[in-house]
Amino acid sequence: MRVPAAVTGGCGCGVDGGGGCCRGGGKLADWEEGKDDEMKSVVVKGWTRMAQVVPLHDNASAEDDDDDEEDDDEDDDDDDDEDDEEEAAPPYVMAVDDSSVDRAVITALLRRSKYRVTAVDSGKRALEILGSEPNVSMIITDYWMPEMTGYDLLKKIKESSELKQIPVVIMSSENVPTRISRCLEEGAEDFLLKPVRPADISRITSRMLQ
């Protein structure tokens, strides 16, 4: 802050008495009005004194405060978006196969793609779980299994009003065109030939789970 020259001595008003101080409203010789908005010349009982004026509202500070509030709001929105992303669970896939080796393979491929997996060894067990947990994103089932084939499981799922919207993919080690056609006609989304490869998982999940 610029202070007018000679701030000591004189008549006790804080300004040099040698022409710098005036009684009865005299003007300060070294004061250039308008160059320092923080200092103003005020007259109190005939004395001219320097007083610092503190504005109630500083426009620049108010604008800075508004900017800070907007930044805080944007940060809060970003935090909310991050929380939403963290809370969104990955798709839930059920793998059905009576072969423990094939179950392990398909489970590993799905988990490598960041999906949650429940693996069961029969169509009957799959239906039991679906009865209590119908919110499955996709079912991948082997075709040839004892007691209930993958085709039979597919039909039961598509006949259920609660489960029919779940995509079903059939897999088999046998390339039988009539079998494949029958499964697709009954509502299967795809038919994979074993051994299932990572590219197969990527193809079906990108189409059905994104």
From Swiss-Prot:
Disruption phenotype: Dwarf, narrow leaf and low tillering phenotypes. The keyword Phosphoprotein applies. Induction: By cytokinin in roots. Two-component system major event consists of a His-to-Asp phosphorelay between a sensor histidine kinase (HK) and a response regulator (RR). In plants, the His-to-Asp phosphorelay involves an additional intermediate named Histidine-containing phosphotransfer protein (HPt). This multistep phosphorelay consists of a His-Asp-His-Asp sequential transfer of a phosphate group between first a His and an Asp of the HK protein, followed by the transfer to a conserved His of the HPt protein and finally the transfer to an Asp in the receiver domain of the RR protein. The modification 4-aspartylphosphate is found at D142. Residues 61-88 have a biased composition (Acidic residues). Pfam families: Response_reg. Keywords: Cytokinin signaling pathway, Phosphoprotein, Transcription, Transcription regulation, Two-component regulatory system. Residues 92-205 form the Response regulatory domain. Residues 53-92 are annotated as: Disordered. GO terms for biological process: cytokinin-activated signaling pathway; phosphorelay signal transduction system. SMART domains: REC (SM00448). Belongs to the ARR family. Type-A subfamily. Functions as a response regulator involved in His-to-Asp phosphorelay signal transduction system. Phosphorylation of the Asp residue in the receiver domain activates the ability of the protein to promote the transcription of target genes. Type-A response regulators seem to act as negative regulators of the cytokinin signaling. This is Two-component response regulator ORR7. It comes from Oryza sativa subsp. japonica. The lineage of its organism: Eukaryota, Viridiplantae, Streptophyta, Embryophyta, Tracheophyta. The gene is RR7.
